[in-house]
Amino acid sequence: IIICIFLLTLCPLVTLQADDLTQTVSIVPCPVQMVSGTGHFRFSGGTTLVVENAEQAKVVRNFINLFTKAAGFTPVLKTGKMKGDVRFVTDKSLKSEAYRLDIIPEQITVRASDVKGFFYALQTIRQLLPPDIENHHTVNALWTVPCLSIQDEPRFGYRGLMLDVSRFFLPKEYVLRIIDCMAMLKVNKLHFHLVDDNGWRLEIKKYPRLTEVGAWRVDHTDVPFHSRRNPLPGEPTPIGGFYTQEDIREIVAYANARGIMVVPEIDMPAHFAAAQAAYPWLACRELEREVPGYFGGRVPTLHGIRDWNRSACLGKESTFQFIFDVIDEVCELFDAPYFHIGGDEAPKDEWKKCPHCQAKMKEMHLNDVEELQGWFNNRVLEYVKQKGKRLIGWNEILAAGNLDPSVIGQYWTPKRDKNVERHIARGGDVILSNHRSFYFDMTYGQYPLSYTYDFDPGRYHISPRSYDHVLGVEAEVWTEWIDKRPKLDLNVYPRMQALAEVAWSAEERKKYADFKERLEAFKPTLDALGIGYAVTSVAEPGTFQRQKPRRLFYCGDTHYELKLNEERKAKGEK
């Protein structure tokens, strides 16, 4: 027995045999501790799930709906202290989000201290069921789970995925599908990048031109992102879309029901070109312009100018009134305690020449344009704080010496940033999103799957003694190089599974070879969900095989890996 327990604790991928039934125990992310039992528990229409209260019932109802769709029967849900086949028991000795799961042939017992823990226990049971549980049509199967005991809790409280819908707009239904997969993998924060140079994606009732103008651009999808030309005046703008405020309420409610917090990002003061196309007075130079199809500040105007005039003018009070009005409406829609302002890659040359910005610097006794942005960030922070929110920004904002230390810095840059270290030393908090491990827009030739799985905070000079100031990790799905949903699926899966394990599983439990085996067992679940993914040879190419996709990407062929993946899947590769 001791040997069995030892093997299961170290090797989460285990095949159990009982009553002529063979099932593989394969859970992503890997639990903290798992011990095998004997036999299996079977779900049926007569299975009774007993909860203690309405809050638990709400979580369990979504789990029961899986059986209604895929199995053709609906287990019974009851509230109270009666006997049941699946019992939910509050145990205040467990941490928030932690759970204990005990499965024997006659009963399943789920223990947690809060509804989050109960939810994550159900996601583990969901993965223990046959993959057909994810189908939306009735399947004839044995709906069983193996007997075992699990004790589990997350490594980080903040386990995030950022979705850039500015560069490549995603319909609401696709966002909901991503939320479903995040929930199954215990990823609990959706960072919604709603605004950038290339599109404003959120309805703001006080400023209708943000979506009438700012949400649409010229169709350049047949041209590599970095080769796109300036739009011409009056050229049709069919590419884009936006979310109505009702759409956002639906997305937030759907996510909340699945244990996911939606964190809005309104990028400011840079990456503001779409807003300036709608309202030119937001810029230092009030030129008419179109929504660009490119990034990096090559902002086209009606005068044929390509310049860096994409930062909001920080010297005009009208800019702040606009921003505060937008914040008011955004905070009514999102209940997260965070508000992300981006703040990265802010071109500052305009501020050096702008009479409004220079007058403001003189008035506020600011030494340079870095301090001007720091002053801007602090002013927005104070407004956001009044709304009960905490400000998040990319780590470039930490360069300002006058920044309020309550800001959360999101550390994305590939190299060591001493401003991050200084921020932590002052008691500031950070989220780790380092480029090498967590930029899912990159090809696998550039950053193979192992780069995500092998993430190590120490590589970025985050020492263990600073971990109290690390809220968690987040991966970024930028979409400059993504213009098809199959391409997005390819880039995200199986990287999201690796992200989940980095964010949830204890460091000593992680073993890449074991993860790859469990990943293979997870792929039928993705198939059942209709989600595309990179096959093994694409996600983890050899050193020589990495060269071609990387070279072609830099030459503008962003679809090479997608085509290669489709060819290999057609040949039966997983």
Task: Annotate each PLM feature.
Residues 275, 300-303, 307-406, 413-422:
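Active-site neighborhood of glycoside hydrolase catalytic domains
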Residues 10-21:
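Bacterial Sec-dependent signal peptides at the C-terminal "C-region" and cleavage site
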Residues 19-156, 487, 502-536, 552:
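Contiguous, structured surface segment used for ligand recognition
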Residues 57-58, 169-171, 197-203, 269-275, ...:
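Flexible loop/turn segments at secondary-structure boundaries
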Residues 391-407, 413-574:
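Flexible, acidic glycine-rich loops studded with aromatic residues
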Residues 2-12:
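Bacterial N-terminal signal peptides
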Residues 94-321, 325-338, 354, 379, ...:
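Feature activates predominantly on carbohydrate-active enzymes
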